[in-house]
């Protein structure tokens, strides 16, 4: 491991649901914690308890019963900068235990991130944390690097947003990027709703976290939704039980695949959007005819919401149905795809050829925050 080397770069992937942070050159992030800031709902009565006015990450998660939880990143885009600063502070000082002023820092951003946001990230890094150098990379591009490719189309689906990003020779093609505001958090909400129909009530932000756990442990994508519904109706072979924190055991049946089916049929939650298979196809069709073949053959999945068992087979089936019949279609779903953005960042930041790409403190002082548009693309 490489903490001793004072110039090791830091890699911080700020997701809507989880922050993944660690050192460039490592093969996995050192710290993975929820992107949440919690504030007490009640006035503290225990004097001398050292109660804080805010909690971040796992600590907020463990005290969730008495806190109001807020996510500063919505749909992949930072919306609350004060809370975001708290999260970064927690990342550097409590999780990684490093002094940010000693390490170049690679941050990630959502595709089509507003320009003002990139500038604000740059400004906070240099002015609040005094980093010596920094870089902002697009999440989907890093996932592609992590799979060992420079051309392909990435389906990146996390907690807050889903994107289809076609990439050719390392460059994202912005005109063909598709954004779908439907991701893990919406699936959790939908599961809360359909479990309520079974008579189980989940309402608070704390209970939502329980449902998220049920979703991650028990949900899967059906290859054929109608068939699966019929099977679920006629037998109990698909039923699974889950023990709640208070010891009560609940049973869940067709909810297991009805929940992630929303990715393919957003109308389940009242959205008019196309499903992820259609957005992938539409994104490919917006690209130059000459590169489509390469994109069809390199469909890379990344992000936690692509972790459902069965999703790759279903995707293969759906895209095959949409694409020209002779087209070779390949879905790449690496087992570590939950962290592939971070892994790609770790690879990128440790390449010798990348070292001249960093925005240095000196360049920032000369040009100001807008330097990020010139150096990071």
From Swiss-Prot:
The modification N6-methyllysine is found at residue 86. Residues 112-125, 360-372 are annotated as: Interaction with alpha-actinin. Keywords: Acetylation, ATP-binding, Cytoplasm, Cytoskeleton, Disease variant, Hydrolase, Isopeptide bond, Methylation, Muscle protein, Nemaline myopathy, Nucleotide-binding, Oxidation. The keyword Cell membrane does not apply. Changing residue 185 to D: In CMYO2A; requires 2 nucleotide substitutions. GO terms for cellular component: actin cytoskeleton; actin filament; blood microparticle; cell body; cytosol; extracellular exosome; extracellular space; filopodium. Belongs to the actin family. It is linked to Congenital myopathy 2A, typical, autosomal dominant: A muscular disorder characterized by generalized muscle weakness, delayed motor milestones, hypotonia, and muscle fiber abnormalities on histologic examination. Histologic findings include abnormal thread- or rod-like structures (nemaline rods), intranuclear rods, clumped filaments, cores, or fiber-type disproportion. The spectrum of clinical phenotypes ranges from severe neonatal presentations to onset of a milder disorder in childhood. Congenital myopathy 2B, severe infantile, autosomal recessive: An autosomal recessive skeletal muscle disorder characterized by severe hypotonia with lack of spontaneous movements and respiratory insufficiency, usually leading to death in infancy or early childhood. Longer survival has been reported. Polymerization of globular actin (G-actin) leads to a structural filament (F-actin) in the form of a two-stranded helix. Each actin can bind to 4 others. Interacts with alpha-actinin. Identified in a complex composed of ACTA1, COBL, GSN AND TMSB4X. Interacts with TTID. Interacts (via its C-terminus) with USP25; the interaction occurs for all USP25 isoforms but is strongest for isoform USP25m in muscle differentiating cells. In vertebrates 3 main groups of actin isoforms, alpha, beta and gamma have been identified. The alpha actins are found in muscle tissues and are a major constituent of the contractile apparatus. The beta and gamma actins coexist in most cell types as components of the cytoskeleton and as mediators of internal cell motility. This is Actin, alpha skeletal muscle. It comes from Homo sapiens (Human). The gene is ACTA1.
């Amino acid at each position: 491991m490489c903490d001793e080397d004072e110039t090791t770069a830091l890699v911080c992937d700020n997701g809507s649901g989880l922050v993944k942070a660690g050192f460039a050159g490592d093969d996995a992030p050192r710290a993975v914690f929820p992107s949440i800031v919690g504030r007490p709902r009640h006035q503290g009565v225990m004097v001398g308890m050292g109660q804080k006015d805010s909690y971040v990450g796992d600590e907020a998660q463990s005290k969730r019963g008495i806190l109001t939880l807020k996510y500063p990143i919505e749909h992949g885009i930072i919306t609350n900068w004060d809370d975001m600063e708290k999260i970064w502070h927690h990342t550097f000082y409590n999780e990684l235990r490093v002094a940010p002023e000693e390490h170049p820092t690679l941050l990630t951003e959502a595709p089509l991130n507003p320009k003002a946001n990139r500038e604000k990230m740059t400004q906070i890094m240099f002015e609040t944390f005094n980093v010596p150098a920094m870089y902002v990379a697009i999440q989907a591009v890093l996932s592609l690097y992590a799979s060992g490719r420079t051309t392909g189309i990435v389906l990146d689906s996390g907690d807050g947003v889903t994107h289809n990003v076609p990439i050719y020779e390392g460059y994202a093609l912005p005109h063909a990027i598709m954004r779908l505001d439907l991701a893990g958090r919406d699936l959790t909400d939908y599961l809360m709703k359909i479990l309520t129909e079974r008579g189980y009530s989940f309402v608070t932000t704390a209970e939502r976290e329980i449902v998220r756990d049920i979703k991650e442990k028990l949900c899967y994508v059906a290859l054929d939704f109608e068939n699966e519904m019929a099977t679920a109706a006629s037998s109990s072979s698909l039923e699974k039980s889950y023990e709640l924190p208070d010891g009560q055991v609940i049973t869940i049946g067709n909810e297991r695949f009805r929940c992630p089916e929303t990715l393919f049929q957003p109308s389940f939650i009242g959205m008019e959007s196309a499903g992820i298979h259609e957005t992938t196809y539409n994104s490919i069709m917006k690209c130059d005819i000459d590169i489509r073949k390469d994109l069809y053959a390199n469909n890379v999945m990344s992000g936690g919401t692509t972790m459902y068992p069965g999703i790759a087979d279903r995707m293969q089936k759906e895209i095959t149905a949409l694409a020209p019949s002779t087209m070779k279609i390949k879905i790449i779903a690496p087992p570590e795809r939950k962290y592939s953005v971070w892994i790609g960042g770790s690879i990128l930041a440790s390449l010798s050829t990348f070292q001249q790409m960093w925005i240095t403190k000196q360049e920032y002082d000369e040009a100001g925050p807008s330097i990020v548009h010139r150096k990071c693309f």
